[in-house]
UniProtKB/Swiss-Prot annotation:
GO biological process, one term: ubiquinone biosynthetic process
SUPFAM superfamilies (UniProt xref): Ferritin-like
Gene Ontology molecular function: 3-demethoxyubiquinol 3-hydroxylase activity; metal ion binding
Binding site for Fe cation 2: 87, 139, 171, 174
UniProt cross-references to HAMAP family, sorted A to Z: COQ7
Places the protein is found: Cell membrane
Binding site for Fe cation 1: 57, 87, 90, 171
The entry's keywords: Cell membrane, Iron, Membrane, Metal-binding, Monooxygenase, Oxidoreductase, Ubiquinone biosynthesis
Entry EC no(s): 1.14.99.60
Protein name: 3-demethoxyubiquinol 3-hydroxylase
InterPro entries cross-referenced by the UniProt entry: COQ7_proteobact, Ferritin-like, Ferritin-like_SF, Ubq_synth_Coq7
Annotated gene: coq7
Length: 208
């Protein structure tokens, strides 16, 4: 069971994720590219898609924190912590791009975080192989979702496309790492439920 220190650290992480700008150690992908001259419709579409991606990173932070809270193996905890650090960079990249596009973040971010944290904590309680399997499947689905966004983003919006492309590469790496550390293949019904939940989140975050 998680101790009080872990709970306090988790609460602090939640506040920082939701209330303070995320920081990145790596350069933001696409920084060197010129800003495209997008029309209002294209700009709105890019901002909405990047908002969805930002929500995805909010959820990823919460999932990893929940999983790490209940994970039983120190090595698994370290794997989750490393993935969370890279997701923090994704959070910073998407937030910066939303601001550049004069967009806004989702109004439901606290809800997304709370729900994802609970799911992650439950996954951790199932044992490390299922915990890592859940991580791997989550990253596979996120990678596929990012691929869909690459097909929807305006072709001229090279800055957003560069960010999403690098995020997709990172997510694939997280999935591979989780499997290498012993992640189990999830049953198909679980995968389908995850896809349905993801669909609700992405459709809602596009607008709200």
């Amino acid at each position: 069971m998680p101790n009080l220190d872990k709970l306090i650290i988790g609460f602090d992480h939640a506040l920082r994720t939701l209330l303070t700008p995320a920081q990145t150690l790596r350069p933001v992908p696409g920084t060197q590219l010129p800003e495209a001259e997008l029309n209002d419709l294209e700009k709105s579409e890019s901002a909405a898609l990047m908002r969805v991606n930002h929500v995805g990173e909010i959820c990823a932070q919460a999932l990893y924190q929940g999983q790490a809270l209940t994970a039983r193996n120190a090595e698994v905890q370290q794997t989750l912590a490393q993935a969370a650090r890279e997701e923090t960079e994704h959070l910073a990249w998407t937030e910066r791009r939303i601001n550049e596009l004069s967009g806004r973040k989702s109004l439901l971010n606290p809800l997304w975080y709370g729900g994802s944290f609970a799911i992650g904590a439950f996954a951790g309680l199932l044992g490390d192989k299922w915990n890592l399997g859940f991580l791997a499947e989550t990253e596979r689905q996120v990678s596929a979702h990012l691929g869909g966004h690459l097909s929807r983003l305006p072709h001229a919006d090279e800055k957003s496309r560069a960010i999403v492309t690098q995020m997709q590469i990172d997510e694939a790496g997280h999935a591979t790492t989780a499997v290498a550390y012993g992640g189990a293949e999830l049953p198909m019904p679980v995968k389908l439920v995850m896809r349905m939940a993801s669909s609700v989140m992405t459709r809602t975050a596009y607008w709200v």
